[in-house]
Amino acid sequence: MADTKYIFVTGGVVSSLGKGIVAASLGKLLQARGFNVALQKFDPYINIDPGTLNPYEHGECYVTEDGHEADLDLGHYERFLNTPTTRANNITTGRIYQNVIRKERKGEYLGKTVQVVPHITDEIKRNVKLLGQKSQYDFVITEIGGTVGDIESLPFLESVRQLKWELGQNCLCVHLTYVPYIAAAGEVKTKPTQHSVKQLQEVGIQPDILVLRTEHELQPDILKKVALFCNVAPDSVVQSVDVPTIYEVPLVLQQQHMDETVLRKVGLQVGPVPEMRQWHEFLEMKHTAQETVTIALVGKYVELQDAYKSIDESLMQAAIYNRKKLNLISVHSEKVTEANVAETLKDMDGIVIAPGFGSRGVEGKLVALKYARENDLPTLGICLGMQCMVIEYARNVLGFKDANTTEIESNIEHKVIDLMDEQKTVTDMGGSMRLGAYDCALRKGSKLAAAYGKEFVRERHRHRFEFNSQYREAFEKAGMQCVGENPETGLVEAVEVPACRWFVGVQFHPEYNSTVVNPNPLFMAFIREAIKTRKKDKE
């Protein structure tokens, strides 16, 4: 295709409506029609990236293949499209201003007064078009974070306005709004949507397609009313009624021919219907699963729904492919004690020890791990979760009672987890960890190698601390095997206890490499083992 088509997804009325899901769903439908699609997210906050943001503030921090800390929506993009993202797929206001200031210091604007318009908006437009110019994408779908009317979104919306003017038919805007249901009146209200569109029009943008989030199905007269008062064609008003799972959203949009509407508006032939066989099979497995596998996720941010989003989704995908429903139980690690651990975990088929940073909640994770190991409960530790496995084993099996990570306590004898050598001179917090995909060689005959079905994998990382190799021999002799390591540095990236049915820890993050059509083998194997445990316990 000669010209890349650019689609912007904006949001109005309230935040958290699911712009990322709508963008990913539309991208999936276009991809299923044979188009090459890229998705990107523009966030209006001034942080360079979300790497230093507390999960309570922003939810999960996602990590791309090339080592960029990104918004969790990139996880949705990858899970829906089954294609990796990069640094170019997530831009923040902070990055935009940083780039402009750097150019100003280099003299690229010499003689000019640097302003929001045109310099900031030009930099935004440059980043929007970057993916389309560097790669052969037919569509670039850009999600604009925030809500129309927010001050911080104005430069992005001005950039969208300019691009719609510059690109003409090759650019369109999808606006997602909320249609509330007033229970007392027994009716839905479209006025918030009308006002949201009016705000968008005030900055010079006429939306081409409206997507209406609603809890109740909207009648044709409501859709016609919205079309009339928002100046949108009737066939360009799409409703997104709440569904049991986000993976049904592409089918909901397809049923209303949203992908066909997009193709017509950008001047392309509609062609055959999208090839969504695998997607339908996935949902069929989900809806027909009868039995349940119960997994405990032990972490310190479990009360926040988005804090471990990729782990939640990876476990759910693995359960579905194993023909089971997932019953995911959130266990706050700060609340786990020796007194209550047995009661807390007794009905679990397996547990996952979540990643994280800092000392809060670590002792609870250690208590949970001791119980799981001694009761042969299938356990998967991720990042800090693996490090906690090492600490627990050092204290309770090797007898190193003061064993710890130097992230928590440096004045100890047994530093079984220590700061990586290359991190010891690092002073900046942001973007300075060991980030992105690295190779890992797996030990032949290990449970981990069996899970992956190969002895060489590449997974993503996000950490500063590592297993202290000085203790490797002691751990091996005591029964904890180092079964994965970086072939270049020798860094231990995975451990397991062969005497247990499944007690595996990995320094990397397998959840960043699991999609709807390609679930991560490690989660698949873990869920299989949990199912076996459930059956054995029943017998």
From Swiss-Prot:
Belongs to the CTP synthase family. The lineage of its organism: Bacteria, Pseudomonadati, Bacteroidota, Bacteroidia, Bacteroidales. Its EC number is 6.3.4.2. UTP binds at S15, K189, T190, K191, P192, T193, Q194, K225. CTP binds at S15, D150, I151, E152, K189, T190, K191, P192, T193, Q194, K225. It comes from Porphyromonas gingivalis (strain ATCC 33277 / DSM 20709 / CIP 103683 / JCM 12257 / NCTC 11834 / 2561). One of its GO terms (molecular function) is metal ion binding. Mg(2+) binds at D73, E143. The active site is at C383, H509, E511. Disulfide bonds: none annotated. It catalyses: UTP + L-glutamine + ATP + H2O = CTP + L-glutamate + ADP + phosphate + 2 H(+); L-glutamine + H2O = L-glutamate + NH4(+); UTP + NH4(+) + ATP = CTP + ADP + phosphate + 2 H(+). The gene is pyrG. Homotetramer. Pathway: Pyrimidine metabolism; CTP biosynthesis via de novo pathway; CTP from UDP: step 2/2. This is CTP synthase. Residues 294-536 form the Glutamine amidotransferase type-1 domain. Residues 1-268 are annotated as: Amidoligase domain. Pfam families: CTP_synth_N (PF06418), GATase (PF00117). ATP binds at S16, L17, G18, K19, G20, I21, D73.
